[in-house]
Amino acid sequence: TNLVATRGAPMLWLVAHLDSKSQPIPIVVRALAISASLIFLGVAMGVGFAQLLVPMPPFVWHALAAVELLASLPVMMSVVGARSVGALDNASGAATVLRAAELLPRDSSIGVLLTSAEELGLAGARAWVRDGGIAPVSALNIDGVDDTGELRLIYSRRLPDSMLAMLGDAWPKPVALVPGVLMDGVAFADAGWEVVNVSKGSWSTVRRIHTASDDLSHLEGSGVEEVALKLAGAIAASRR
């Protein structure tokens, strides 16, 4: 179930997902495995094209198949569990969205969307952009706000120029989403929205995601207030 609240007729939506999960394979390993699988798939296609010109011995294909299988094992082993309470991923994002909305002037037109099933293929976000009856506008998706680490702006598909202009120069330069990593912003970008994903953390943050260590003993919430203030300030300034 997605939770939706609006003030006025919003042209900007603040988004965060509510669900959490645990997985036995770290997210970094999964991303590397997906990237490696795509690389070896490209190599196999190149070898297939070369075979039209030069015969290839069978062992080449056997070796490629074995390497591709090994590369895909971490992905196949990434079963979903419930050992993570999801303090960082993504109670912190939901808290940031609600706090930013609270800080904005009461007459600000804004939409708030708290999605479900992000951890299950972005199902909640994809259902909402498909069936919610909202024409594509702009969204800020908040996913993972740690107490320490760098603030990051992440995008998929096209560069969200107008969103970056709204945020201003005080924010970091955006980076493309790592292959194999999914965020609700992907569902919005696929549906034609202009969207920026916002995260704060470090490699230590990434190691906690989807593990039993993602709990309140490892998160105080200071980053939530910091990012919410920064978001609300940028949104309010853009409307003056």
Task: Write out the residue ranges for each language-model feature.
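Short acidic/His/Gly/Ser-rich catalytic and metal-binding motifs that mark active-site loops
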Residues: 21-25, 72-76, 148-150, 204-209
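Active-site-adjacent substrate-binding region
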Residues: 137, 145-240
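Acidic/histidine-rich catalytic neighborhood of metal-dependent amide-processing enzymes
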Residues: 1-2, 52-163, 177-185
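Active-site beta-strand-loop-beta-strand hairpin of nuclease catalytic cores
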Residues: 9-13
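A non-catalytic alpha/beta surface segment that caps or lines the substrate-entry region
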Residues: 1-8, 25-54, 58-62
